[in-house]
Amino acid sequence: MVEINRKTKETDIKCKLNLDGCGKININTGVGFFDHMLEALSKHSGIDIDLTCSGDLHIDAHHTVEDCGIVLGQALKKAIFPISAVERYGNATVVMDEAATTCALDLSNRPFLVYEVNVSGKVGDFDVELVEEFFHAVAGNAGLTVHIIQDRGRNKHHILEASFKAFAVALRRALVKNEKLGIPSTKGVL
């Protein structure tokens, strides 16, 4: 179990994360759709996430979403590294009705994000462009290389939910224990 707390003039976030969990969820960011996406991430990764955020929602959800990504990324980095005896790579294609999204990731300790999800506008009152900000913050702070690519879809909610679930399943697969691998790098370090 790792714990990260972060307080700025814009947000106050408390996060507990357990990689060896079973997807126990306690999430409250004040942004309903975003909470729903984080719950999907926790459930489908098998990672216990306890996250609360008090943010400047009177402005908009940008700081809340981005800062939650920063904190979740920091918690993942603290929980994952130094890395040893895991698969390291994970990928998944997840469908939700007409939508399909693929995520491939590497626990590389080299942050990089490719985000090719073609949605714009809002789901309810949630600006969908914030999802890219979230994944950029997670990848950057966790030290992950992440590719999220929309294969098909029309419904924004379905496309974004498939994206979060694909990331979750790919992460779960990358974290699968494999004692034969030791440090999963020809360099001997990640």
Swiss-Prot record:
Keyword Protein biosynthesis in record: no
CDD domains registered for this protein in UniProt: IGPD (cd07914)
Listed GO biological process terms: L-histidine biosynthetic process
GO molecular function terms attached to this record: imidazoleglycerol-phosphate dehydratase activity
Domain of life: Bacteria
Protein name (record): Imidazoleglycerol-phosphate dehydratase
Chief localization: cytoplasm
Compartments reported by the entry: Cytoplasm
Record EC number: 4.2.1.19
Pfam annotation, one family: IGPD
Cellular-component GO terms for this entry: cytoplasm
Coiled coil (UniProt feature): none
Keywords associated with the record: Amino-acid biosynthesis, Cytoplasm, Histidine biosynthesis, Lyase
UniProt catalytic activity: D-erythro-1-(imidazol-4-yl)glycerol 3-phosphate = 3-(imidazol-4-yl)-2-oxopropyl phosphate + H2O
Enzyme category, top tier: lyase
Known pathway: Amino-acid biosynthesis; L-histidine biosynthesis; L-histidine from 5-phospho-alpha-D-ribose 1-diphosphate: step 6/9
Organism of derivation: Aliarcobacter butzleri (strain RM4018) (Arcobacter butzleri)
Family: Belongs to the imidazoleglycerol-phosphate dehydratase family.
NCBIfam families: PRK00951.2-1, PRK00951.2-4
